[in-house]
């Protein structure tokens, strides 16, 4: 997608070198927006393969209000493992090798990488096979799904923001309050990772549903391709339920950054030519967005270039 490649190029050419929480370092810009017309095809990278089923299972995990990686692992989705693992290795229950700064050390030290990978595999197996262990160490805190579906009020009640917004789209589509927020300051200290994609808003006009996302922190090479596909999919699912066509997905970013250890991968991607976008295919079986299974969602005509691997910064 040209919009995304333009973002990569802009940050490479105009970004500022900055330090960051992970110690990796970034090239960063502040305030950038991309627009995608969802009528023109499903916006997923074609200049590198994005594992769409992982996008689907993560979004369904959010929609279920789940915050435990066990569901993700049951669907062969490993994208949240590092944050749960980090909590475990910092606990008194962990008795293995020192895992301080495991992400950076695994990237730089092949011997340590083998130890880390073995510890991670043991951790994943325990999450899948030991429900008690999963309940304790598979939890990531009150992250996205919990805030979307069970925002806690000062009176001890809960608000299902997503269900409320869907109902409002049906009954009052001209509302300017079609907003869901994952940014709950009270819960931030207890989250494994504070929400990067923090708030989204819907807009109805001319029989079409559009969505704008505000993302406070945007990992351009690894995270943003998932975010684009995820929120485009969410827009399609809700539009289907409320009887609207899809309009635009607008992606607004705060700190949009390229990690220093992703620069060569970005240059490789920029050397590639985008292909035609695929079409989203949804099963007729589910009646609401909360009824979908992974098998109900697929892409037709997705023929991307090969994946480009890059390390994740934790």
Swiss-Prot record:
Organism phylogeny: Bacteria, Bacillati, Bacillota, Bacilli, Bacillales
Cited function: Catalyzes the reductive methylation of 2'-deoxyuridine-5'-monophosphate (dUMP) to 2'-deoxythymidine-5'-monophosphate (dTMP) while utilizing 5,10-methylenetetrahydrofolate (mTHF) as the methyl donor and reductant in the reaction, yielding dihydrofolate (DHF) as a by-product. This enzymatic reaction provides an intracellular de novo source of dTMP, an essential precursor for DNA biosynthesis.
Quaternary structure note: Homodimer.
Sections of the chain in a coiled coil: none
Cell compartments where the protein resides: Cytoplasm
Pathway: Pyrimidine metabolism; dTTP biosynthesis
EC numbers, comma separated: 2.1.1.45
BP term (GO), one: methylation
Reactions accelerated catalytically: dUMP + (6R)-5,10-methylene-5,6,7,8-tetrahydrofolate = 7,8-dihydrofolate + dTMP
Listed name of the protein: Thymidylate synthase
The keyword Methyltransferase belongs to this UniProt entry's keyword annotation: yes
GO molecular function: thymidylate synthase activity
Record: residues binding dUMP: 21, 176-177, 216-219, 227, 257-259
Single GO cellular component term: cytosol
Family: Belongs to the thymidylate synthase family. Bacterial-type ThyA subfamily.
Binding site for (6R)-5,10-methylene-5,6,7,8-tetrahydrofolate: 219, 313
Annotated organism of origin: Listeria welshimeri serovar 6b (strain ATCC 35897 / DSM 20650 / CCUG 15529 / CIP 8149 / NCTC 11857 / SLCC 5334 / V8)
SUPFAM superfamilies attached to this UniProt entry: Thymidylate synthase/dCMP hydroxymethylase
Enzyme active site: 196
Gene3D superfamilies, per the entry: Thymidylate synthase/dCMP hydroxymethylase domain
InterPro entries recorded: Thymidate_synth/dCMP_Mease (IPR045097), Thymidate_synth/dCMP_Mease_dom (IPR023451), Thymidate_synth/dCMP_Mease_sf (IPR036926), Thymidylate_synthase (IPR000398), Thymidylate_synthase_AS (IPR020940)
Keywords, in A-Z order: Cytoplasm, Methyltransferase, Nucleotide biosynthesis, Transferase
One of the Pfam families matching this protein, by short name: Thymidylat_synt
